[in-house]
Design a protein with these regions (language model features):
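Helix-breaking motifs and short loop linkers at transmembrane-helix boundaries and internal kinks
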Residues: 43, 75, 96-98, 130
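Extracytoplasmic gate region of multi-pass secondary transporters
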Residues: 10-57, 61-62
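Intracellular juxtamembrane helix-capping segments at the cytosolic ends
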Residues: 115-129
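A late C-terminal transmembrane helix in Major Facilitator Superfamily
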Residues: 129-164
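Structural signature of the two symmetry-related core transmembrane helices
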Residues: 78-93, 169
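Paired small-residue
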Residues: 90, 101-109
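Helix-to-loop junctions at the C-terminal end of transmembrane segments
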Residues: 63-75, 159-160
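Multi-pass alpha-helical transporter architecture, strongest
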Residues: 172-186
């Protein structure tokens, strides 16, 4: 039937998508910019520059493996708010540190913070009744994945006109926005 062929997402679904956009933006920036950041800003050897994304990714994987238990223990709101704060704090730590090793720790904390935010956000769409769940998930993840695709280019523009540290500071600020809106997911 043509009943659910196209439905504009409502503001709740768009909010979930935008919050996922920010979290996926963090992943895209870590993938595309962390090595260059470590080389240019923290003076790490080129051969070790991949450690930035590796530390981020390892903690995303670890966090996801522990995710169900964390959500049961802490609840959805604390996972989103705490994850946003931890991720923002990790990025901030990487900016203010003077040693690349501390920046790696910051990237790891960012990964741990981001790990369960998007899964919790996406799972929240099962509670909405505006549109069929599969369409709501599709709409939100489409918005979210634009963060991986377009985000690094946007941050590249920020870095071009200022610095890589400024681009990472923008990311930290956006992750604080995720934390600020986390209370809406009770």
């Amino acid at each position: 039937s043509g009943k659910d062929s196209f439905i504009w997402p409502n503001s709740w679904i768009v909010l979930v998508g935008l919050m996922c956009f920010i979290v996926y933006l963090a992943e895209g920036i870590m993938l595309d910019w962390s090595a260059l950041y470590l080389i240019e800003e923290k003076h790490i050897a080129t051969a070790q520059a991949g450690l930035g994304y590796a530390s981020f990714s390892a903690m995303v994987a670890t966090g996801r493996f522990l995710g169900d238990g964390l959500v049961q223990m802490l609840g959805r709101v604390r996972v989103i708010v705490g994850g946003g704060l931890l991720a923002a704090g990790g990025v901030a730590l990487s900016i203010i540190s003077t040693h690349w090793g501390v920046s790696l720790l910051g990237f790891a904390l960012c990964g741990l913070g981001c790990a369960n935010v998007s899964p919790v956000l996406i799972s929240s769409l099962s509670k909405q009744t505006y549109m069929p769940t599969h369409l709501a998930i599709t709409a939100a993840t489409t918005i979210g994945f634009a963060g991986v695709l377009a985000g690094p280019a946007m941050m590249g523009a920020v870095a071009h006109y200022s610095s890589l540290s400024a681009a990472f500071a923008v990311l930290a600020g956006l992750l604080l926005v995720v934390a600020a809106f986390g209370h809406r997911f009770k």
